[in-house]
């Protein structure tokens, strides 16, 4: 009876606190979720509206607007939320900073609204992962793994614009805009020749390879619990204590396929490796983008091989450099008078006076 009376006196704030932190809810909210939900809702709503109906944005700050929305002629592939104008630079540009809504849209205000709310939302999502793990008594490595894609998002949406001096250099929010960002990044920073990007490629493709290898090995060494007429999936019951596959058989197969010590004999160390490999690789990629944001670029091996007479023997580094120069001169064509990359090459002799005729 005393318990019933005491629970009846719980105020609204206490009930809200209990609901927020209740791990028996179908979807755990958590205190980080209180921040995450409105931020991601705001970012998603603004993104959808801008992707469909936003007017053209003066991204380069030279009064040549670029249209990114569907009703301005784009499709799902070519459409994007265009980054805020180079005229805005790194200034914080909420709606109330503009003289009118039309000016805010023309200068790409929706991009900042989406990006800032998105970054806060996904950061809170990582905090929510830690919070739920803590309340369930689990180890905290889920949020550590999630920090890899989180760091990548911060690198392309925040750190890179900071380093370049304008949010107009941030990654557009669309498919073709992402590809354009990648091509321009290669042209300006030679990211393919940066060792941190190479480690990131090894992390992503290596992680895909290891995931496929692990899944196929487990699927091929399942303990048979069903007949030929039934699906093997029916041989597993959620929460069962016994192993569903024979790790000894998988270890023996893979050890003989390559060599003994290439195969894990400990399931825990195996799954740690499967998590750590791509996470560390993506961490390195994020660090690479963050350093190239401040123009600490990839290796330059241009014209590094010469013959005995001092003539250049072109390598693939020179081929890549030619491609970089082509991409550099083609992007933002009307914003550059003369690209510095071309001005930095060997000078071409020109006649300083007219030749004498006769």
UniProtKB/Swiss-Prot annotation:
This is Photosystem II protein D1 2. Coiled coil: none annotated. The record marks 189 as: Stabilizes free radical intermediate. It is found in: Cellular thylakoid membrane. It catalyses: 2 a plastoquinone + 4 hnu + 2 H2O = 2 a plastoquinol + O2. PSII is composed of 1 copy each of membrane proteins PsbA, PsbB, PsbC, PsbD, PsbE, PsbF, PsbH, PsbI, PsbJ, PsbK, PsbL, PsbM, PsbT, PsbX, PsbY, PsbZ, Psb30/Ycf12, peripheral proteins PsbO, CyanoQ (PsbQ), PsbU, PsbV and a large number of cofactors. It forms dimeric complexes. GO terms for molecular function: chlorophyll binding; electron transporter, transferring electrons within the cyclic electron transport pathway of photosynthesis activity; iron ion binding; oxidoreductase activity, acting on diphenols and related substances as donors, oxygen as acceptor; oxygen evolving activity.
